[in-house]
Design a protein with these regions (language model features):
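N-terminal leader/targeting and accessory segments in enzymes
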Residues: 1-92, 96, 271
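Nucleotide phosphate-binding/pyrophosphate-handling subdomain across enzymes
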Residues: 2-5, 15-25, 263-369, 383-386
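Helix N-cap at the beta1-alpha1 junction of Rossmann-like dinucleotide-binding domains, i.e.
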Residues: 13, 35-38, 238, 375-379
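Residue-level signal for inorganic ion chemistry
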Residues: 22, 67, 108, 137, ...
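Phosphate-binding loop of NTP-binding sites
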Residues: 23-24, 59-62, 71-215, 219-230, ...
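Short internal beta-strands
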Residues: 27-34, 211-215, 345-348, 367-376
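Beta-strand->loop->alpha-helix junctions that form or flank phosphate-binding loops
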Residues: 33-35, 53-55, 91-96, 229-246, ...
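C-terminal helical cap/extension that packs against the catalytic core
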Residues: 40-49, 358-414, 448
Length: 448
């Protein structure tokens, strides 16, 4: 990077890490961002970085030979396209990490379950005595910590479709694909393109790498033909030749047709069949890294729910409340609904990413006893769910109103579930902001 002149587009968490890395490597950095706040200006001034805020255009490419694109900036953004047309190198924070990382990388992708499986995989590898750094689409950027890594270490990354799109050659020593259902169609334009990006997690492997694939998901299963890596399958509902399955209440690891017990399914500490599948994926990754079965089981048994993913909030007036704010698409909400046998009062709604609401409305009407909607999709979702046959539907003006209305609908013994099925950007800064405000509002309104 020494002597390079970089333009960083977007100064969020990823952009900050890229700018700092390039400066550490001896390059110069300028930043452009559509946002313009006193806090952002002060932060850039403290970092000693020149910037243009409030918008950007082709003139910002002058004097630049490297363009770094943040995950929130579309890969077909006009400024990025112009940079390519001018022959400039275009990269991303996560691509810079892949190029410079001395350690082995395990990547977890899929439409849902990435964060939980990434966190659990990191714990499974640590249980095997390995040095592990966790990051990617969660936590602090790994590029900020790259100097801490050595060749014998592992990095476990959560990789979104946005990140996979921005990495030139995402070679993973272990690549896990959990599931692929329609998501981010507003950005990727088609499901086919979305699948293509997810496939990149296994497409650049060598013969000694491992692709951990969900055979219950036909799109994932089809990726077997797209990788040179050794395939480790996992599945609850389809036969598994070499990989992780269940039998007679046990999670089993089948190696060359020889099944071995790993742990009892009843000992999985997270609710829902989808979380059982996530645990099986992490065990597959641990097997690929050479971790002993008993150590994998110990790590899985002591694992705690990740924040905003079916996270227990508390019991109030006899109803159990859960924060599943990370459910930003319908498939994630379907899995959350399937995790409970009790009557469910669902809080849902937000900003749509180009998803058809009709299948979601039918599932909600069939599965829940009451619905409270909010956000941009709230009115349409409420109407469609009523049309699908559910009468107990309320429309909330804001989060506090949603909590109060859900509490009024919830009898003792029921579950109140925030699982929005849509993104948070209409009302909140991100899903974490939505989840934390939800927990605080529940405790403030209901008395704890």
């Amino acid at each position: 990077m020494s002597g390079r002149h970089a333009l960083v587009i977007g100064y969020g968490r990823s952009g900050r890490a890229a700018a700092a890395f390039i400066k550490r490597q001896g390059g110069t950095v300028r930043v452009v961002d559509r946002a313009d706040t006193p806090e952002l200006r002060a932060e850039l001034e403290r970092a000693g970085i020149a910037a243009r805020l409030g918008g950007y255009g082709a003139q910002d490419l002058n004097g630049t030979d490297l363009v770094v694109v943040s995950p929130g900036v579309p890969w077909d953004e006009p400024l990025v396209e112009t940079a390519r047309q001018r022959g400039m190198e275009v990269t991303s924070e996560i691509d810079l990490f892949f190029r410079a990382c001395p350690a082995r990388i395990a990547g977890i992708t899929g439409t849902n379950g990435k964060t939980t499986t990434t966190a659990l995989t990191a714990e499974v590898l640590r249980a095997g005595g390995l040095q592990v750094m966790r990051g990617g689409n969660i936590g602090e950027p790994v590029l900020d910590r790259i100097e801490q890594l050595h060749a014998e270490d592992w990095v476990v990354l959560e990789l979104s479709s946005f990140q996979l799109e921005s990495i030139e050659r995402p070679r993973l020593r272990i690549g896990v694909v959990l599931n692929v259902t329609p998501d981010h169609l507003d950005r990727h334009k088609s499901f086919e393109r979305y699948v293509e990006l997810k496939t990149r997690a296994v497409a650049f492997m060598e013969s000694d790498d491992h692709a951990v694939l969900n055979v219950d998901d036909p799109t994932c299963a089809a990726m077997r033909s797209e990788t040179r890596g050794r395939v480790i399958e996992f599945g609850l509902h389809h036969p598994v030749g070499n990989g992780v399955t269940t039998s007679d209440g046990w999670i089993m690891m089948a190696d060359a047709g020889q099944p071995r017990r790993v742990m009892r399914t009843a000992d999985v500490p997270l609710p829902g069949e989808h979380n059982l599948s996530n645990v099986m994926a992490a065990i597959g990754a641990g097997y690929a890294a050479g971790v002993d079965a008993e150590r994998m089981a110990e790590a899985a048994r002591r694992f705690k729910a990740v924040e905003h993913r079916l996270e227990p909030v508390g019991t109030f007036h006899g109803a159990r409340w859960y924060n599943d704010s990370k459910a930003t698409n319908p498939d994630s909400t379907y899995k959350a609904l399937a995790a409970f046998r009790e009557p469910i009062i669902l809080i849902a709604g937000g900003r749509n990413k180009g998803i058809d609401l009709e299948p979601l409305a039918r599932t909600i009407a069939r599965r829940v006893t009451g619905l409270v909607t909010m956000g941009e999709t709230g009115e349409e979702l409420a109407r469609r769910v009523r049309d699908a046959g559910l009468d107990r539907v309320e429309r909330a003006a804001d989060l506090g109103d949603a909590v109060r209305k859900a509490a009024a609908l919830a009898p003792p013994g029921s579950v109140v579930l925030l699982s929005p099925a849509f993104t948070s950007y209409d009302m909140f800064s991100d899903y974490e902001d939505r989840g934390r405000r939800f927990k605080a509002t529940v405790r403030a309104e209901l008395g704890q």
